[in-house]
């Protein structure tokens, strides 16, 4: 189960043009977004470690997103 709240995900889907959103659809998207965010975060942590830092910086996140 996703840790991301369902309500903001529901709003994102509605912002994309949906009039109604099922709870299952919002939960599935939340799970996918969480998996993708975790993947990016792990890459960013590796980049920070490689640079000899413990702190993840915005540059690490940007680079992780591009890779």
Curated annotation (Swiss-Prot):
The region called Interaction with DNA is annotated at 20-22, 54-57
Q: Name one Pfam family in it.
A: CBFD_NFYB_HMF
Localisation per UniProt entry: Cytoplasm; Chromosome
Chain segments annotated as coiled-coil in the UniProt record: none
Keywords, alphabetical: Chromosome, Cytoplasm, DNA-binding
The record's annotation in InterPro entries points to: Archaeal_histone_HMF, CBFA_NFYB_domain, Histone-fold, HmfB-like
> Mostly located where?
cytoplasm
Annotated SUPFAM superfamilies: Histone-fold
Single GO cellular component term: chromosome
A molecular function annotated in GO for this UniProt entry is:
protein heterodimerization activity
So what does this one do?
A: Binds and compact DNA (95 to 150 base pairs) to form nucleosome-like structures that contain positive DNA supercoils. Increases the resistance of DNA to thermal denaturation (in vitro).
Tell me which family the UniProt entry assigns to this protein. Answer: Belongs to the archaeal histone HMF family.
Q: How does it assemble?
A: Homodimer or heterodimer with another histone. Dimers then assemble into higher oligomers, with the DNA wrapped around the protein core.
Q: What is this protein called?
A: Archaeal histone B
Species of origin: Pyrococcus abyssi (strain GE5 / Orsay)
């Amino acid at each position: 189960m996703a840790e991301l709240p369902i309500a903001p995900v529901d709003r994102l889907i509605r912002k994309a043009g949906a009039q109604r959103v099922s709870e299952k659809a919002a939960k599935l998207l939340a799970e996918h977004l969480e998996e993708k965010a975790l993947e990016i975060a792990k890459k960013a942590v590796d980049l920070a470690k490689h640079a000899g830092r413990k702190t993840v910086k915005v540059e690490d996140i940007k680079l992780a997103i591009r890779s």
